[in-house]
Regions:
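Intrinsic-disorder-associated, low-complexity terminal segments enriched in Asp/Asn/His/Tyr and depleted
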Residues: 2, 8-9
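N-terminal Sec-pathway targeting helices
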Residues: 9-29
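Hydrophobic alpha-helical membrane-insertion segments, chiefly the h-region
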Residues: 29-38
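Structural helix-adjacent loops and short alpha-helical linkers that scaffold large soluble proteins
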Residues: 40-51, 96-112, 155-169, 210-223, ...
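CBM-like carbohydrate-recognition segments
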Residues: 42-55, 59-82, 123-128, 136, ...
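Extended ligand-binding groove/face enriched in aromatic
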Residues: 79-81, 85-87, 92-200, 383
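Well-ordered alpha-helical segments within folded domains of soluble proteins
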Residues: 81-97, 140-156, 194-210, 250-269, ...
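Extended ligand-binding clefts on enzyme/binding-domain cores
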Residues: 143, 182, 193-321, 334
Length: 399
């Protein structure tokens, strides 16, 4: 009797899951048909839109990460999302200040406040192994320290007399020394877990420190990319793997959410490797639908399901993070056609919530709390870094 009920329950749940994913997929398929009659053109956010998006993030950052705040709420899903909401907002503010000098002072103030929140216990605490309040660089996690160091570098660029300069030097120095003595070549995000994309953030931060101060820390990035080229590419695709063990041996295959993330930060210290990985990512993990291009979480797999924390829900193997990060890569690397395709795809999946002064986002069809992470990520993704220019690319076979 119990076995029969359990079997009935499994069949029912399977049917409900299939129905749910069909409901998710149907609007996308209809949109593809409608969109196929027009040609994509990348359109950066307008100034009024940017103002509202910045206003929302400024309010969230100003409220801090204490109980009852949006940052605390997003952190209930995973503490990483609180940190990323702050760090990617800072990267976006820095990009915007590079385009609009009139925003520079405000960007500096917002970045300073974001760093203050990132140093607070609710954000910092989940990443600590050992911690001394006077020296945040004793935190073990490269995930936390990498983003903190890059945020500090952004503040130093925006405010040359940054009050955080000593901390920036301390954190960058600690990271550099750890990379020098790490046999695996990649530092830990958590105990026993070494993800390549988390390390690319820290290495981008070290390269940025070198540009700002003349330090030798960019050498760590050069050593890392040399090893990545030799040891951390998949034999069949050439794509960088996602994770290595304590000896530096690959332990997890290439994944769209990891690649998309890593390529953007790679471009900050090795433009050649970033461009190569971007082309391979597009070739092996994406499908061209004319005016849309969609990226899979795992090359060659078309699974539909709940996915995991990094991928989120999968529809025929395609994931939201893989496509969001691919948009950022396309904008940063100047691939205007692909940026337009991905911008349109992202627009199909997001629901805009707008007031007279603010703008934030939700997810269509499913109830998935994403604010303020979605706002920070999309603002970062849609704004080219300083010196980048979104430009048309020559036509390519299979583009």
């Amino acid at each position: 009797m119990h076995k029969s009920l359990a079997r009935h329950y499994r069949i029912r749940m399977k049917f409900q899951l299939r129905r749910r994913w069909l409901l998710l997929l149907l609007p996308v398929l209809l949109a593809v048909v409608c969109a196929s009659f027009s040609r994509p053109e990348y359109k950066p956010p307008t100034r009024p839109e940017l103002r509202k998006r910045v206003n929302y993030l400024a309010r969230v950052i100003g409220e801090g990460a204490g109980p009852g705040t949006p940052l605390a709420a997003i952190g209930e899903q995973t503490p990483e999302w609180t940190l990323f909401s702050l760090s990617f907002a800072v990267y976006a503010f820095t990009h915007l200040a590079a385009q609009d000098s009139g925003f520079r002072a405000e960007a500096g103030q917002l970045t300073g406040r974001a760093i203050e929140v990132a140093l607070s216990e609710p954000v910092r605490g989940p990443f600590e192994y050992v911690y001394r309040p006077e020296w945040p660089d004793t935190t073990r996690s490269v995930l936390y320290l990498g983003h903190l160091a890059l945020m500090l570098g952004c503040h130093r660029q925006l405010a040359p007399n940054s009050r955080y300069a000593p901390l920036h030097d301390a954190v960058a120095g600690a990271l550099y020394r750890r990379f020098e003595r790490e046999p695996a070549g990649c530092l830990e995000s958590y105990r026993g877990q070494r993800w390549l994309p988390d390390n690319t953030v820290a290495l981008a931060a070290l390269a940025w420190h070198s540009r700002l101060t003349g330090s030798p820390y960019a050498a760590a990035a050069r050593r890392w990319t040399a090893r990545a080229r030799q040891q951390w590419r998949e034999p069949g695709t050439g794509l960088l793997v996602s994770q290595v063990d304590s000896a530096g041996r690959p332990t997890e295959e290439a994944r769209g959410s990891m690649l998309g993330w890593g390529i953007w930060f790679l471009a900050q210290f090795d433009a050649e490797l970033a461009a190569e990985q971007y082309a391979l990512f597009r070739r092996h993990a994406s499908t061209n639908l004319g005016v849309l291009r969609v990226y899979r979480e795992r090359p060659g797999r078309y699974t539909t399901g709940l996915g995991d924390l990094d991928s989120g829900p999968l529809i025929l193997g395609y994931s939201i993070p893989a496509n969001t990060f691919a948009l950022a890569d396309a904008v940063a690397l100047g691939d205007a056609r692909n940026a337009a395709r991905l911008q349109r795809l992202v627009a199909l999946g997001r629901r805009t919530v707008e007031t007279s002064t603010e703008m934030r986002y939700g997810v269509r069809v499913v109830d998935l709390p994403v604010s303020p992470l979605a706002e920070a990520l999309l603002l970062w993704a849609e704004l080219p870094p300083a010196g980048a220019r979104v430009r048309p690319r020559p036509a390519e076979a299979g583009q």
